[in-house]
Amino acid sequence: METIINPRILLLLLSSVIMALVIMFVPPVSQDPGYHNFADQRNISGIPHFWNVVTNIPFLVLGITGFFKIQKQELTGILPDFFRAYLAFFMGLVLTGLGSGYYHLDPSNLALVGDRMAITVTFMSFFVLIFGESISTRTASRLLLPLLFLGLASVVYWNITENLGTGDLRFYALVQFLPMLLIPLMLLFYGSCLSGRRWILAIILVYVVAKIAEMYDQQIYELIGFSGHSLKHLIAAFGAFLFLKGVEVRKPIK
């Protein structure tokens, strides 16, 4: 698992380069002001946008639970070399719960900065963990801090460009969606040094369903009285729950 001298790595590199080039040649995309106009605007118990706020609580619970379980170092489904990456993932969940909850109290570009920073911490940590169990633990452990920096930098860059009146989401889009392209490729072309790969496959599927729910925010709200965006929070939290269960039951492959 420690070597990446394999022709299949070229597919990952080529995919990364192609997507980066595509993003580079796409005109800058600013944040749509309508993005903040979510379907469920209800104020309940004095809390504005109640369900979009409180559906972030599972992220807090799962993040705190996972953080302390990882610190005990009693879980079988973790790679010892990646202790910091697991901690970063679960801390990212905690920050996502806080950042998203705060954002939904009064949605704005400024509040969205913290939300997106937290999400990038979770995304980059998850990507590093999958890279490590699939390709190279040594290389992945070296990637954690640079990728976290790039993720946070993408949000800072977007915020600066928005403040300058020339909003540019391209860098952030690359950071968010490139891992979602590369992870399935790693699952398809590489094995794992941990058992139970189906846990990761389930997490990817759940993430896709969550994004679909987000896309149909208004339609789902009109259909069931509960918005697609709030449902997205719960579905994504279920994905985090699957990850936590995975690190409890997966085992190293000798």
What annotation goes with each model-predicted range?
Residues 2-147, 153-165, 189, 194-253:
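Early transmembrane hairpin module of multi-pass membrane proteins
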